[in-house]
C-alpha cells in the first residue's frame, strides 16, 4: 500500500505520518527528511536545497525526484511507503507515477489534510525544529517536555527561517499556486480523500484512519467529517 499524506505547510502532515508509518508498518518517505540529511552532510545538493528552503521556495523537481527515486530503490519500500510532503507539483506526480509504474506499483491513496490559511500561519509562526532529527514543536500547540530541547535526542531547538510569519505566508502562497493542482491529478485517478485537519491530533488521526478504512471499503473522493 502506497499512501501520500498531502496538505499545506503547517497542516500536521509530519505528526500524523509518524503515527501512520508505525500503524501500517511501512517506511515514511519524506522529502523534508531526505533534504535535511543532505544539508546535514554538507553536500553540494544540500547547500542548494537550503538556499531554496530559506527563501520559502519549493525545491526544483529534478532535484527532488533524484532523491526520492533513490529512496524508492531501497528494499524496505517493497511492501509500500508513506509519502509525506511529496509530490508537490503535477510534474512530480506524473514523474512519480512513471517511477512507480516501472516497479509495477502506484499511489493507492492520497489523504488531503485541509486547514484554513490563518490557522496555518498561527501554527507555523514560532514553530521550533530539532536540527538533528527534524521533529517539530510549537510553544503553545505542541511544546517540548523540556524548554527548547528535543524530546527525542535533547538537541537544542531552533526556529527555521521558513517558519517566521512573513515567510510562512509566502510558503502557503507558493503551495496554493503550485501544489493544489496535484489534487486534480489524483482526483482523476479517484484516489483522494479530504480530511478536516482542524482540532486535536487524535481527532485528526481518527479522521485519517476512517478515510483509509473507507477506501478499503470502496469509498473515495468524499469529505471526512
Model-found features: residue ranges?
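Glycine-rich phosphate-binding loop of ATP-dependent small-molecule kinases
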Residues: 1-225
